[in-house]
Amino acid sequence: MGMPPGDEILTHRLILPRDANHHGTLYAGVLLSMALEAAYATSYRAAGLNANLVLKRVLDLRCHEPVRIGQVVEFRGREVHRARAQVVVALYGTPLPGRSSPWLDAMMQFVQVGDSGRPEPLEGEATAPPADLLPPWLALRDRASRLLAIRS
């Protein structure tokens, strides 16, 4: 098994001019790439060192605040759901200076695959989702559960 339940993975990124759009704020394509990196790092740690994960789908990604060039952003990541061959991680963008709410939140679903590219069970036993999740993880897990019920 990977990281102990309750552990968070932190990812920090400096927003550079090459990351910006014509408004001088974080470009959506770069945002998606950064979020995917943070989510993959979180899912990899959750699944264990022998993980061979692929992104199945972005369940939800919301950017609540524009991020300017020169700001350092923090992604907090945590596993919020696990099944036989998949792990769902949530991301929470730590509030920017002078703000009280997150600049971003997201949920992404990753699947463990074998050499054939087909799903394979994750290492260790499937665990029930923690019942004692604290904010913001409880709300993100509940939102992910509703979105998982929608088949793509």
Name these PLM-found stretches:
Residues M1-Y27, A131-S152:
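Catalytic strand-loop segment that frames the active site of acyl-thioester-processing enzymes
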Residues H12-I15, R62, Q109:
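Generic structural detector for well-ordered beta-strands
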